[in-house]
Amino acid sequence: MTFIFQLALFALVALSFLLVVGVPVAFAAPEGWNVTKGYVFQGVSAWFALVFTVGVLNSLVA
C-alpha cells in the first residue's frame, strides 16, 4: 500500500510540475489556448483526482 501511495504522490508532483510549466505556455502562445484548452482542462481534472486519491491513500497508509 505504501508503494501505491508513493507512486500516486510522485504522479501528483510530476503533473503539478507539468501544469506549472504548461499552462503559462498555453496562455502565452498566440493561438495556443484555443488548441491546448482541452489538454489544460484534462490536466487540471487529473490533478484534482490525484489530490483526492493521495488524500485517501494517506489516510490508509498512516
Swiss-Prot record:
Under the heading InterPro entries, the entry gives: PSII_PsbZ, PSII_PsbZ_sf
Offer one example of a GO biological process linked to this entry.
Answer: photosystem II stabilization
Ranges annotated as spanning the membrane? 8-28, 41-61
Task: Please classify the protein's predominant subcellular localization into one broad category.
Answer: plastid
Per its UniProt record, what Pfam families does this chain match?
Ycf9 (PF01737)
Membrane topology reported for the UniProt record: Multi-pass membrane protein
Instruction: Describe its function.
Output: May control the interaction of photosystem II (PSII) cores with the light-harvesting antenna, regulates electron flow through the 2 photosystem reaction centers. PSII is a light-driven water plastoquinone oxidoreductase, using light energy to abstract electrons from H(2)O, generating a proton gradient subsequently used for ATP formation.
| Protein name according to UniProt | Photosystem II reaction center protein Z
Where does this protein come from, organism-wise?
A: Nephroselmis olivacea (Green alga)
* Gene, per the UniProt record: psbZ
